[in-house]
């Protein structure tokens, strides 16, 4: 089982009108199981994972209790809240996700247009549209739910997967590309085909 959960309401400054409206609290879980060897072309087809600490200052919560312990002075200064260089994160996300999607698609051998659905971390509609545009794909290939939930951080992909299954956008034999990205800066993309026996 893979679980993604974040309570962003605890780390986003409610007085920050640029950031507060973008985030939501959310949780989701995905149950994984082994694919039998005789089920060719099912399961995980390709993946890419990475991180680049040079961008660690672009998305931070300075007084998170690890490197900088919580203090009264820090709380008074608002250092318990997330700080983000939105423009730099935007540029990084579009470039990096597009590169990693291309890499995963290449390694999988599945043509880009043959993928049934793309589920990206629901960070920002402009980022999703920028990535979609750079890949030359139609809007219908992408699931977007951040208009209803906001950016739920690590909850966004499990929530989107659940929504896609319930809506019939993913079914037995569907090929789905998933890509997450965020603080650190870190990212992960994978391409999988649903088991024909999945329900």
Model regions: which residues?
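Condensing-enzyme catalytic core mediating Claisen C-C bond formation in acyl metabolism
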Residues: 16-91, 95, 99, 181, ...
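Conserved catalytic cysteine-centered active-site region
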Residues: 38, 133-161
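Phosphate/pyrophosphate-binding loops at sites that engage ATP/ADP/AMP, CoA/4′-phosphopantetheine
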Residues: 100-114, 164-169
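Catalytic phosphate/nucleotide-handling subdomain of diverse soluble enzymes
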Residues: 162-179, 191
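Conserved small/polar residues in nucleotide/adenosyl-binding loops
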Residues: 192-199
């Amino acid at each position: 089982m893979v679980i993604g959960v974040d309570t962003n309401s605890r780390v986003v400054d409610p007085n920050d009108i640029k950031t507060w409206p973008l985030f939501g609290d959310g949780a989701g879980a995905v149950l994984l199981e082994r694919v039998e060897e005789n089920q060719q072309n099912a399961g995980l087809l390709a993946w890419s994972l990475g991180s680049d600490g040079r961008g660690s200052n672009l998305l931070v919560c300075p007084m998170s209790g690890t490197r900088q312990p919580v203090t009264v002075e820090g709380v008074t200064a608002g250092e318990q809240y997330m700080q983000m260089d939105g423009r730099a994160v935007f540029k990084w996300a579009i470039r990096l996700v597009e590169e990693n999607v291309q890499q995963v698609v290449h390694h999988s051998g599945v043509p880009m247009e043959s993928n049934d659905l793309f589920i990206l971390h629901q960070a920002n509609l402009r980022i999703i549209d920028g990535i979609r545009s750079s890949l030359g794909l139609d809007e219908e290939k992408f699931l977007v739910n951040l208009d209803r939930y906001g950016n739920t951080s690590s909850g966004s992909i499990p929530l989107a997967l659940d929504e896609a299954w319930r809506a019939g956008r993913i079914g037995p034999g569907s090929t789905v590309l998933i890509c997450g990205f965020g603080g650190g800066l870190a990212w992960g993309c994978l391409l999988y085909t649903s088991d024909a026996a999945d329900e």
